[in-house]
Amino acid sequence: MNKKLIVTAMGVALAAGMGMANADVKVYGQLDLSIDAVDVDGGSDDVNMNSNRSAVGFKGTEDLGGGLKAFFKVEYQTDMDDAGTAAGPLEDDTNEGDGKDGWKSRDQYIGLKMEGFGKLTFGMMSTAYKSPASKLDPFYRTRNQSRNVGLQSSLHKGRGEEGQGRATNTVRYDSPTFAGGAKVFGTYTLDNSEADGENDDPYSVGASYKAGGIYAFASYITTDRGGNDDATQFGIKYTMGDAAFWGMYEIDGGLITSTSNPNLGDGADVFNVGASYTIGNNLVSFDYGEGDDVDLDGGGTLNTSYTTWRLGGYHKFSNRTRVYATFSEQDFDAAVAGHNKGEQDIFSVGLRHNF
């Protein structure tokens, strides 16, 4: 058996044992499998099963007294559809971990928090750019999640030190809630790669507000290299009874472009709007989005524009188990960034259980 798998299993077993004696340690997870049909104009059509970032982890806290607490989280993604291989071609986050044995690192950190001060976190975690936007996606961590189908940019994907959604070698600060629902947060990533000869330490900052039926946020991220290396986003969601409406706009200062293709430029802005309605244990939703062309540094444009939409729904059997179905259609203006000119259609049906 792979050594990494053994170590992971031992860690989870140890956490479970600790949990019996200490209620502040919890074993948790999300298991999700879907059958996905993909139809690409000018490309291959396929039907596959995908594990959609199913994960198992453990987390806990220790009260240190005087209002100070220590906390930790260690989470691994597992590919239940084929645990002996890396994420398949339909997965968007193939660099979430090494993937050599079906287990990949997700959030893994340790930190301190104090009443009235907030919390400091050290390790691997979501940037201040990625974390607030996931709350606008009713199908987050599914095959048709927003970042997979162009409703959100590539800055919400991946793992690494160069502006990816999950930042490694990172320090994060989250403030306590103030002014009736406001928070500020930020990350600073240390450049641990000596081979690249660069001293760029990416960072991100953000703010959010949540009160009543309103949730709003704004955040900024940069690789701190100078030039085309940043992005800014704004988002809002309004919930009114059983209905919810949301919108989000990402302004590309070059970082969205650089993570999508090797061209130097900016202007590849992304926006989306959506709505959902809940009826008992059922939810239906619709989203529409667009991506803009890249403005090249040397002049001219690169035709990267597209339109995209998604229709979906789910039924909750309980608070922990649900079934869902989604359909998305992304229309590209030209052959760029690995996509052929035309449409990419994805139909997905899945089952999810949280514990």
Task: List where the protein language model places each region.
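Outer-membrane beta-barrel proteins
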Residues: 1-355
